[in-house]
Amino acid sequence: MADLSIFSTHHLHPEVTEALSGIGDYRVASAPTPEAILAESSGAEVIVVRAPIPVEVIEREQGLKALVRHGAGLDMIPVDAATQAGVLVANVPGVNALTVAEHVIWTALALLKRYPEVNTDLRERGWAAGRAHSDFGRELSRRTIGIVGMGN
């Protein structure tokens, strides 16, 4: 079996890059723009998607076999055009669920403690200005927090 022609819209983790290079001719877009993707993805059989894919890529690439979203959503892939062309569309749902959950907790704490304002004042006006915020931050103790999830 001949090597696959694999194109990625972005640089990926070194271990992933090594694995993909081991199974095919692996190329990366010079920029994650529609123009660069359209110009540089020629001949790709598999495209790893982290930037919007122009529908023209699907229309042009007769040998395109798969568009694989490096993430949970499919919003960057013109799914209808891919389906019509017989191109497999895949993603990795739930892959970042823990990271998103941690980010929600961090953001809630940052807002409770007024982190954005404190950080700005510390950087722009020094310790005394940042210290003044200590009277306005709230404690998490004895509070109820509700988190509503949408998805995995």
Where are these regions (language model features)?
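Phosphate-binding beta-alpha-beta segment of Rossmann-like dinucleotide-binding domains, i.e.
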Residues: 85, 93-144
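Residue in the alpha/beta-hydrolase core beta-strand immediately N-terminal to the catalytic nucleophile
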Residues: 68, 144-146
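An N-terminal-biased, well-structured beta-alpha scaffold segment characteristic
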Residues: 1-90
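Glycine-rich Rossmann-fold phosphate-binding loop(s) that bind the pyrophosphate
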Residues: 150-151
